[in-house]
Structure formats: structure tokens, C-alpha cells
Amino acid sequence: MFQGASSLSLDAKGRLSVPTRHRDVLSATAGGQLTITKHPHGCLMVFPRPEWEKFRERIAALPMSAQWWKRVFLGNAMDVEMDGTGRILVSPELRAATGIVRDTLLLGMGNHFELWDKATYEAKEAEATQGEMPDVFQDFAF
């Protein structure tokens, strides 16, 4: 459903303009309603509300041994809605938790997006691509 990378800037109020190519899909499939939460790799996950509900149910069903991860995902989730110009507000708490100040990278990851501080993503990608590829790619043809 969602793919590709977009370099975006937050405005002074912490709002992000969703790229035009994604707005129509988000309006049609989620009524412009999204949920943003933390990702364990230091970015944010941005879900269309129906996809969030599926993810939330899976997380909520985890055993007590995963209680802290439930807190990370569910306790930090914030519901947002695209405004008339396609902007969403990224809360100060979520921005602070991920180091997002202004320059960001929005990555389409299939059924959701990842929102990264641009410099953080570039550093992590450079580090990952300098190392060996995971074994799961051993039989993968490029």
C-alpha cells in the first residue's frame, strides 16, 4: 500500500504535510485518521487507523512478559487527523523521544509509515549497509 521515501520538514508547530500521493489513500481508507507511536528502532510508526487497530489488537494480546513493550507501543500511541491541507501534528513527546526536530524522512513500509529524524536514518542506513546482509537474504535474488 505505502512505499517510497519522502524528505519532509516539520513546521514550527510540529506539523508534517503528508505527501500528496498518500493523502487520497489515507482519506479513502482511514478518513484521514492516523495513529502515531514509538518504534523500537528510534523512529515513529504512523498507521492509518484501521491498520493501527489490527496492530493494537496483536500487541494487546501479548503475554505479561511483554508488558513493557505494550507500554512502549500502546502507551505512547497518539491519534491524529489530517487537517484540510493534509497536515498531521506530531506531538512534542513523540518528537522528543525520537530526536525529531525539523528535517524528517517518511518511509512507506507497506501498511504503515516510519517517520525518522533524517540525520538519524541516514546514519543508521549507512551503518546497516556497510555490514553483512542478514542470512534471510541468502537465497534472495536481486
Curated annotation (Swiss-Prot):
Q: Name one GO cellular component term.
A: nucleoid
Q: Which SUPFAM superfamilies match?
A: AbrB/MazE/MraZ-like
Q: Which InterPro entries match?
A: MraZ, MraZ_C, MraZ_dom, MraZ_N, MraZ_sf, SpoVT-AbrB_dom, SpoVT-AbrB_sf
Which compartments is it annotated to reside in? Cytoplasm, Nucleoid
SpoVT-AbrB domain location is 5-51, 77-120
UniProt KW keywords:
Cytoplasm, DNA-binding, Repeat, Transcription, Transcription regulation
Any matching Pfam family? MraZ
Q: What is the protein's given name?
A: Transcriptional regulator MraZ
Which species is the source of this protein? Variovorax paradoxus (strain S110)
- Please spell out the taxonomic lineage of the organism that makes this protein: Bacteria, Pseudomonadati, Pseudomonadota, Betaproteobacteria, Burkholderiales
